[in-house]
Amino acid sequence: MTDTKKKLGLVIHTVWFWIAWLFFVPLLVQYLFDSENYIADFLGEIITIGLPAQLLISYRDKSKEKKEYLYRIEDVSLKRLPHKGLMVSMLSCMLLFLFVTYAINTAQLVYYLRTKEFYSFSTVEEFHLLGFTMALIINALLPALLEEILYRGLYRDTFRNHNKFIAIFIPSLVFASLHSNIIPMSNAFLLGMLLMILYQRSGSLKLVIILHAVYNILGIIFNQYVSLPFTTLSLFNSGSNESQIVYALVISISVSLLSLVMIFLSVGYCFKGNNPAMKINRNKSGFMDIIMIIFFFISAVLMILLKITNPGAA
C-alpha cells in the first residue's frame, strides 16, 4: 500500500510538471518578463520540480500510527566512500559527456557529408562573468540539486523493492521524457541511467548531485563558450575542406566508441565490493526551503546586476 502511495505521488508530479510547463511557465514569461531569462528559468524550475519535490518529501503517511514520512531518501556521507570510487565515478560522468558530444557530432558530420548543409547545436558566445555565473547557478547547480532529490532520491525509494533494472530504467525514462526534444531526451536518459547506477552502488545522493552539476557545467562551457576539437562548430569556423571533415568524422567515431567502452569499465569498477550502511535523511531540517531561498536571493541579485551592467541582456 505504501509503495502504491509513493508511485501515485510521482505520477501526480509528472502530470503537474506538464501542466505547469505547458501553461503556467509560458504565462509567467509572457506577463512578468520581456522574454525568457534566468529568473524565469529559476521560477520555472521551482514551480515544476522544487516545490512538488518539497511537498512529496514533507508528506506524512497518516495511515501509520506515528505518521512517518512517506518517502525516505538514502544518503551516505562522501567521507565514507572510497577515494578511488569517487574519482572513477567523476571520470565516468566526464566520459559520458564526451560520448554524447561526439556521438551527436558524428551524426552532424554524416548529415553534412550527405546534404552539404551545416547544422550545429552549439554556439560560441562572448564570455561575460556575470552571465556565466548566472548560468552556473540557475542552469547547472539548481537543476542538479532539485532533479537528483526527485528523480534519484524519491524514485530510488519508491522502486527499492523492484529489480535493479526497473529501478534504474523507469526513473531514467521519466527524467528523459520531461525534456524538450530527441537530443536532450537521449542525453538525459543516458545521464539518468549512469547517475542511478552510481547512486545504487554508492548510496550517496550528494555524490550524484555533484556529478549532475559537473555534467551541466561541462555542457554550459563546451556548448556556449568553447568548441571541442573536431566538432562541427570548430571545423566550419576554421573553414575545413571535405577531406578534413572526413578525418574529423573518423576521430569523432573513435572518441565516441572509446568513451563508451571506458564508461562500462569505470561503472563496473566504481565502489566495487563497497556496501556502506545507508543513512536515512527525512528532511527534518527544512534543507530544501533554505536552499530555495538562497538560490532565489542570489539569482535575483545577479539578475539585477546583469541588467545594470548590460541592459540588453536577457
Residue ranges and their predicted role:
Residues W21-E65, L249-L257:
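Alpha-helical transmembrane segments in multi-pass membrane proteins
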